[in-house]
């Protein structure tokens, strides 16, 4: 529901694959629309595991997850990978169990096995300060940082080697009031997206009733002057459109956005709606990525115009009307 620009294009491309297996905690539009087989995964109380809260091997803290309950035949993500790996390339999976794999990983990382982590409840690695002075930041063991020069680089020599400007620079968006004034006449508002709400993480948690009661609908923030200009009322449905696509969200009239800008939420779908084709939980109805073009990216292939496009808006009766 939020992974890419031009989502319908990717949806049609994925349908051409011969076979798709999906695993998740809940049914989703992707599963309903694409998966040949759905494997429900175990929730965190249903499997053993290791908590690494700070990006894997960069963590300073580890905790043990101890399986508390077992329901049906669900397996964790790692157990599914483990079972597949043992069958497809057994030489790459020499461990006899997932917990043995955890012990192997821990022995290399902190020097003790999974059973000891369970006994400890949690482990915090000792801190080392000024690692750059001791050669602990670089793969070659030399003092400094893991950059070409070993220094904190305000000028990135690596970017220069890749053919980009080694210094920060600004490029006007491909579609903006300044770069495309003719397009701006037809689509006179700047569209920005991607703001977060604490009730969800991208498309996650839309199916949790208590969180949906807090944020029941997708919202587009509009300045009062802009709302008055286009006849839009607070709480009313709005269609957002540009040359690439359209979607619908509910208006939140607020002075916190610039009158020239609207801010639309992303990652919406409606688990209460029909999940079968062609609806797929209504994932394309409030899909702000419908308005995002493909391949409008930076020189090195990064970025997309999720924060800076042009659009127009109009009041509508509802999500489907």
Please give the residue ranges for each predicted region:
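Short, glycine-/Ser/Thr-/acidic-enriched flexible segments
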Residues: 1-2, 26-28, 43-46, 67-69, ...
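Glycine-rich phosphate-binding loop of nucleotide-binding enzymes
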Residues: 1-37
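Short acidic, glycine/serine/threonine-rich loops at helix termini
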Residues: 5-7, 31-35, 49-53, 203, ...
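Short, solvent-exposed amphipathic alpha-helical segments in soluble enzyme
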Residues: 8-15, 37-38, 181, 206-210, ...
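Short His-Asn-centered micro-motif
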Residues: 22-24, 41, 222
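Flexible glycine/proline-rich, aromatic-decorated loop/lid segments
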Residues: 26-64
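Long, contiguous, secondary-structure-rich segments that constitute the structural scaffold
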Residues: 68-71, 75-122, 208-221, 225-321
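Long, low-complexity segments enriched in small/aliphatic residues
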Residues: 102-208
């Amino acid at each position: 529901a939020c992974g890419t620009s031009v989502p319908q294009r990717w949806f049609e491309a994925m349908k051409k694959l011969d076979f798709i297996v999906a695993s998740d905690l809940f049914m989703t539009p992707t599963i309903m629309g694409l998966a040949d087989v759905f494997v429900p995964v175990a929730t965190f109380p249903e499997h053993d595991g290791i908590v690494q809260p700070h990006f894997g091997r960069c963590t300073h803290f580890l905790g043990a997850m101890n399986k508390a309950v077992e329901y049906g035949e669900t397996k964790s993500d790692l157990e599914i990978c483990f079972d597949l790996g043992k069958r497809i390339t057994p030489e790459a999976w020499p461990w006899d169990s997932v917990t043995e794999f955890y012990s192997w990983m821990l022995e290399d990382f902190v020097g003790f096995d999974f059973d000891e982590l369970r006994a400890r409840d949690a482990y915090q690695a000792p801190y080392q300060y000024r690692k750059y002075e001791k050669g602990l930041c670089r793969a070659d063991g030399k003092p400094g940082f893991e950059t070409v020069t070993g220094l904190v680089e305000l000028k990135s020599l690596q970017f220069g080697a890749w053919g980009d400007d080694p210094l920060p620079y600004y490029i006007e968006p491909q579609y903006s009031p300044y770069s495309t004034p003719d397009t701006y006449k037809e689509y006179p508002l700047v569209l920005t997206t991607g703001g977060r709400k604490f009730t969800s993480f991208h498309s996650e948690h839309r199916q949790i009733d208590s969180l949906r009661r807090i944020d029941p609908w997708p919202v587009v923030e509009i300045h009062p002057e802009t709302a008055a200009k286009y006849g839009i009322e607070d709480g009313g449905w709005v269609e957002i459109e540009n040359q690439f696509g359209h979607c619908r969200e509910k208006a939140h009239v607020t002075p916190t956005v610039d009158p020239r800008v609207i801010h639309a939420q992303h990652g919406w779908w409606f688990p209460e709606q029909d999940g079968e084709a062609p609806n797929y939980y209504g994932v394309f109805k409030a899909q702000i990525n419908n308005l995002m073009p493909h391949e409008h990216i930076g020189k090195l292939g990064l970025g997309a115009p999720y924060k800076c496009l042009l659009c127009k808006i109009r009041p509508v009766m509802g999500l489907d009307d």
